[in-house]
Amino acid sequence: MNDLTLPSVSVILPILNEERDLSNCISAILQQEYSGNIEIILALGPSKDRTTEIATELAKFDSRIKLVSNPSGQTAAGLNLAIAKSSYEVICRIDGHSEISRSYIKTAVEIMSKQGAVNIGGLMYADSE
């Protein structure tokens, strides 16, 4: 697969009370070693901290970040709302407190392409709390 054939990817995140980790999570997504298009869709639940303000600020400075309201705060509802707002066929689900490696999306897309898979998953390891 060369850069000209890389599919565009919608990264979706159901978000609730992620004030501490959200900026680092989004930064890791934006620094991906992936030359295809990437958009980030944050499904914002009714957070009791500064999550919504942080997300709004991040979206102001990068047009690839889109916000959608998730009034219930439920993960499944947030995922569905984010998928409905997504522009691309390939969906990558990330948790708002995660920091993915720089090759995460590239590796996932390569595996999907090579295996003809429509869904892949993997283990996540905690570096801290």
Predicted regions and their residues:
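A conserved acidic beta->alpha catalytic loop
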Residues: 44-53, 98
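Short aromatic/hydrophobic "clamp" motif used to bind/position activated sugar donors
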Residues: 91
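Cell-envelope/extracellular polymer assembly enzymes that use nucleotide-activated donors
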Residues: 7-10, 39
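Short beta-strand/loop segment that forms part of the nucleotide-sugar
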Residues: 37-47, 66-71
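Glycine-rich, basic loop-to-helix element that forms the pyrophosphate-binding segment
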Residues: 70-86, 107
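Acidic helix N-cap motif at the loop->helix transition within catalytic regions
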Residues: 23, 49-58, 103
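Short, acidic, metal-binding catalytic loop of nucleotide-sugar glycosyltransferases
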Residues: 27-37
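Conserved donor NDP-sugar-binding/catalytic core segment of glycosyltransferases
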Residues: 103-129
